[in-house]
């Protein structure tokens, strides 16, 4: 028979819009609630918890109960398809199904399905799996996230200023590669300590307690936060924006003009009654309550954060050279006078390593090629055996023998230094005459000395070639010694042509000499770096030389395998490929630094370079005020001129000219103490006259506390005692230049320091030095800037002191038009220098990456470079030419030119008189003589020609004297 089936479904009606909706359950609560059976019937996503199907009696329309169903056998389980169709029917139209009499819905509280004890025919239970809560993603730190991106090769996101500030304020500091606190941490701690100290001095204990309470209140979230020292970065950023819009250089308002920060309230906080307090006097107010008296010039911004980065130091094994060996001079077998002279005049009793290796070989007459580090005594290594061999010759040499030893050096200062050393060495031997020839001196006096005779001649290549072509008494026939000192610098300065011409002239004169018993010519070449061009020069000048390397390890072990060089013998070295002909680095890879030299570099933002240099010098002067010598290397002549004038006027107030002397009394800063009081600045570069260069060089050696601003003209061979610091304000273009620059200090076993200035974009130059086995440490810029704070009464922080000093530089530049022009020229010359780095360093020193506006600020300029660069970028005028630049170098053609010029000389010679008589004879009879009275114009009877008849010679200076013309010459009485 057909039985009616009753389906009891428990549903949960959906909430309507007008009804109040129940709050949504969390994932965790929903997971707990899924243990009970619930039927949620939503239109969007129905969730079936339980379906119970029961059989009931057919005729009655009463609500079925469990008792009306007889307890029979187990009901058969319906098919899955029938259950699915029932569910789909219910979900499609639940209201239609509810109106059916056969199916009735009992909405009751949720209960778990229980099997009927009365025995139902069948029962269908459909359940769903409980909802499992999703696991939250594990949180990772920012460093792990960036590291994961870096491993996957994804681009790193750029941090905002708020993120950087939050990272700096957080307690989790990144680990330093050197396991040392970062400069930024030390700087912030120092600023916090200074703030507390200032507050303690100004307000006493009560104010300090109230300030601490306010700090605690701010930390808990009430009120506005107090201004912290780290906010100076944001203040300076705002000032940089003001400066870019053309309003830089203006002073910021004092604290009375600023709004009271403690009065600011949070949005939900009630406004407290304003407390009135007694105002201090005006003088007290300006001294104690002025919080930010900073000239807003925009020095500290995002680049300052970049400068705080620690680059770290790699493990580098430097090339070591032993300077002193412990052997005495008496062991060389020299003349007793020479040994005593060295002890008395030079205080030298012990030999250096290069001297011990070189002097015995030179005494045996061998050609040598010497490579040794700067300051190891190379000059004495060839000068001492040179004098010893000359004084041994019998019969004694005489002055009239001429030049027996020729020493070629690259610079005039090195000529003076070498000449003074040889003068001391030949003091016991009065018959040996040394002399020097260098550019800038009078040729006439040099010709006279050459005619008298010079036995040991020291000179620069240009002046030596000049006398070789134009001085008949300069003969090199009897030359016995040819020495080339600082050979690599000779080639860098463009003297290769002159050196080659000198060597060819020596060989030609010796070949043409009739005396067949000429002494053998001994040749020596010395350098601190062995470049490929030095090898080529050695091939031209040396004959079977002996290579002497002073490094502790063999130079062949340091050769680069990829270049294919094997330097087992000097012959293989000279037959090297021309592949590195223009490569100026040391091909042996041996770049040795003295062990007592402490190398460091400082990463300085471009806008802080001038201030950082001033603070560095101030710190060193404070450490040793009575005895301090330093050399600051710069790239161009214009930079040296500008920084010399700027630092003198701004930091020492030294009178430079008459106008400064007149304005000295009108200055408003007479009460202030200069930052570098007592320090003297010198400048030295190649464009100065010889008289100026000699005076500067001697003044720098004799001065106790001074700084020399110079180009690379003093980078080679200059030996000035007691130089404590070398600053490379602009980076060198080659590693060899770096080695020679830092070699001006820590000479002959003394101690010294060298500091290299780099910008954040140039920091990878350190890795380039480390590849060359040069160990260098990173210095702290803020350690130098802190020196400015005690010397600035208006500044409260280091940033304020640095900004005030920069403002002082800019104000001085605005008031002095001449100094402003020098600054513009210096900046343009620096731009040209920066674009000429070699190919291998172009990625590090890239002119396209450099921010020219920031670099212009290091020259105290406020204008954009585009406004003045075109004006000062015009090509320079041609330098004054000498006889080597515009005359013929062939001696025969030179003599022909001299004979042609005699016709136009002011000396009254026979040719001139014949020319005058011919011109007078060619004049028409009766015609008046032309005005002017010039030679060759047919004016034989003019006053000028009559004056020539009385004088045998006239100098051109007599015509340019500016004196009034003399009266007409008196006529002679006729007999």
From Swiss-Prot:
Single Gene Ontology MF annotation: ATP binding
Composition-biased stretches (Low complexity): 64-94
Protein residues bound to ATP: 372-379
Annotated signal peptide: none
Family membership noted in the UniProt record: Belongs to the DEAD box helicase family. DDX31/DBP7 subfamily.
Modified residues (Phosphoserine): 75, 99, 210, 220, 224, 667
Naturally occurring in which organism (per UniProt): Drosophila melanogaster (Fruit fly)
Motif DEAD box per UniProt: ranges: 485-488
Task of the protein: Probable ATP-dependent RNA helicase.
Positions of the Helicase ATP-binding domain: 359-548
Superkingdom: Eukaryota
UniProt xrefs under PROSITE patterns: DEAD_ATP_HELICASE (PS00039), HELICASE_ATP_BIND_1 (PS51192), HELICASE_CTER (PS51194), Q_MOTIF (PS51195)
Catalytic activity: ATP + H2O = ADP + phosphate + H(+)
Motif window: Q motif: 327-356
Start-end of Polar residues biased regions: 1-24
Boundaries of every Helicase C-terminal domain copy: 616-789
Descriptive protein name: Probable ATP-dependent RNA helicase CG8611
GO-annotated cellular components: nucleus
Record-linked SUPFAM superfamilies: P-loop containing nucleoside triphosphate hydrolases
CDD domains reported for this sequence: DEADc_DDX31, SF2_C_DEAD
EC number(s) from the headed UniProt entry: 3.6.4.13
């Amino acid at each position: 028979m057909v039985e009616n089936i009753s389906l009891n479904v428990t549903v949960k009606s959906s909430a309507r819009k007008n009804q109040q909706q129940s709050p949504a359950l969390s994932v965790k609560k929903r997971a707990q609630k899924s243990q009970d059976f619930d039927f949620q019937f939503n239109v969007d996503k129905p969730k079936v918890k339980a379906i119970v199907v029961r059989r009931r009696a057919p005729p009655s329309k009463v609500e079925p109960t469990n008792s009306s169903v007889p307890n029979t056998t187990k009901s058969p389980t319906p098919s899955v398809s029938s259950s699915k169709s029932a569910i789909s029917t219910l979900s499609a139209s639940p209201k239609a199904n509810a109106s059916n009499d056969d199916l009735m819905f009992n909405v009751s509280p949720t209960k778990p399905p229980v099997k009927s004890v009365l025995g139902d025919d069948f029962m269908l239970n459909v359940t769903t799996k409980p909802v499992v809560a999703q696991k939250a993603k594990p949180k990772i730190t920012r460093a792990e996230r960036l590291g994961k991106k870096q491993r996957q090769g994804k681009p790193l996101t750029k941090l905002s200023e708020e993120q950087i500030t939050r990272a700096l304020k957080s307690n989790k500091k990144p680990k330093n590669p050197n396991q040392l606190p970062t400069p930024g941490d030390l700087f912030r701690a120092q600023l916090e300590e200074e703030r507390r100290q200032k507050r303690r001095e100004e307000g006493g204990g009560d104010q300090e307690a109230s300030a601490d309470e306010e700090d605690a209140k701010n930390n808990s979230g009430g009120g506005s936060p107090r201004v912290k020292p780290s906010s100076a970065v944001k203040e300076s950023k705002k000032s940089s924006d003001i400066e870019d819009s053309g309003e830089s250089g203006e002073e910021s308002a004092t604290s009375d003009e600023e709004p009271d920060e403690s009065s600011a309230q949070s949005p939900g906080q009630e406004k407290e009654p304003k407390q009135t307090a007694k105002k201090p006097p005006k003088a007290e107010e300006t001294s104690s309550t002025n919080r930010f008296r900073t000239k807003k010039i925009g020095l500290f911004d995002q680049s300052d954060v970049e400068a705080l980065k620690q680059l770290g130091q790699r493990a580098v094994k430097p090339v070591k050279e032993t300077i002193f060996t412990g052997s005495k001079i008496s062991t060389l077998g020299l003349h007793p006078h020479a040994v005593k002279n060295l002890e008395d005049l030079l205080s030298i009793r012990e030999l250096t390593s290069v001297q011990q290796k070189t002097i015995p070989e030179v005494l045996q007459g061998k050609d040598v090629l010497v490579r040794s580090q700067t300051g190891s005594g190379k000059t004495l290594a060839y000068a001492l055996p040179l004098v010893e061999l000359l004084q041994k010759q019998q019969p004694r040499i005489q002055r009239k023998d001429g030049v027996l030893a020729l020493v070629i050096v690259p610079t005039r200062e090195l000529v003076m230094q070498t000449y003074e050393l040889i003068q001391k060495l030949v003091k016991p031997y009065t018959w040996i005459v040394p002399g020097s020839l260098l550019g800038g001196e009078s040729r006439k006096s040099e010709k006279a000395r050459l005619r008298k005779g010079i036995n040991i001649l020291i000179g620069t290549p240009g002046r030596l070639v000049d006398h070789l072509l134009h001085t008949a008494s300069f003969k090199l026939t009897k030359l016995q010694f040819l020495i080339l000192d600082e050979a690599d610098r000779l080639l860098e300065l463009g003297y290769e042509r002159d050196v080659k011409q000198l060597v060819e002239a020596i060989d030609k004169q010796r070949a043409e000499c009739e005396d067949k018993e000429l002494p053998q010519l001994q040749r020596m070449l010395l350098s601190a770096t062995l470049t490929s061009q030095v090898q080529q020069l050695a091939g031209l000048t040396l004959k079977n030389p002996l290579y002497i390397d002073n490094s502790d390890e063999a130079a062949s072990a340091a050769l680069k395998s990829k270049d294919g060089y094997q330097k087992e013998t000097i012959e293989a070295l000279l037959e090297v490929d021309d592949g590195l002909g223009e490569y100026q680095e040391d091909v042996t890879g041996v770049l040795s630094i003295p062990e007592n030299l402490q190398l460091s570099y400082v990463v300085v933002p471009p806008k802080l370079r001038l201030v950082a240099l001033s603070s560095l010098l101030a710190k060193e002067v404070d450490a040793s005020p009575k005895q301090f010598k330093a050399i600051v290397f710069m790239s161009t002549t214009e930079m040296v001129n500008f920084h010399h004038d700027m630092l003198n006027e701004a930091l020492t107030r030294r009178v430079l000219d008459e106008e400064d002397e007149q304005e000295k009394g009108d200055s408003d800063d007479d009460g202030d103490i200069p930052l570098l009081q007592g320090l003297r600045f010198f400048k030295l570069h190649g464009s100065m006259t010889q008289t100026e260069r000699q005076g500067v060089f001697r003044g720098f050696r004799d001065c106790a506390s001074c700084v020399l601003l110079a180009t690379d003209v003093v980078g080679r061979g200059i030996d000035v005692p007691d130089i404590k610091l070398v600053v490379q304000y602009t980076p060198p273009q080659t590693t060899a230049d770096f080695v020679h620059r830092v070699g001006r200090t820590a000479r002959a076993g003394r101690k010294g320091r060298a500091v290299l200035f780099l910008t954040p974009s140039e920091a990878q130059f350190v890795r380039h030095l480390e590849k060359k086995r040069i160990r260098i440490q990173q210095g702290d810029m803020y350690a130098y800037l802190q020196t400015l704070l005690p010397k600035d009464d208006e500044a409260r922080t280091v940033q304020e002191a640095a900004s005030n000093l920069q403002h002082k530089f800019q104000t001085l530049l605005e008031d002095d038009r001449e100094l402003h022009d020098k600054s513009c020229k210096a900046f343009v010359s620096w731009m040209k220098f920066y674009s000429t780095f070699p190919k291998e360093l172009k990625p590090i020193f890239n002119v396209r990456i450099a921010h020219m506006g920031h670099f212009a600020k290091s020259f105290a300029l406020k204008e954009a470079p585009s406004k003045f660069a075109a004006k000062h970028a015009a090509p320079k005028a041609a330098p004054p030419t000498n006889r080597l630049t515009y005359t013929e170098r062939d001696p025969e053609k030179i003599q022909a030119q001299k004979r042609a010029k005699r016709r136009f000389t002011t000396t009254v010679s026979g040719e001139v008189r014949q020319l005058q008589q011919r011109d007078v004879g060619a004049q028409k009879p009766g015609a008046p003589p032309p005005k002017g009275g010039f030679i060759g114009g047919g004016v034989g009877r003019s006053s000028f020609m009559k004056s020539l008849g009385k004088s045998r010679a006239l100098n051109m200076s007599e015509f340019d004297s500016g004196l009034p013309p003399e009266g007409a010459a008196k006529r002679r009485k006729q007999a």
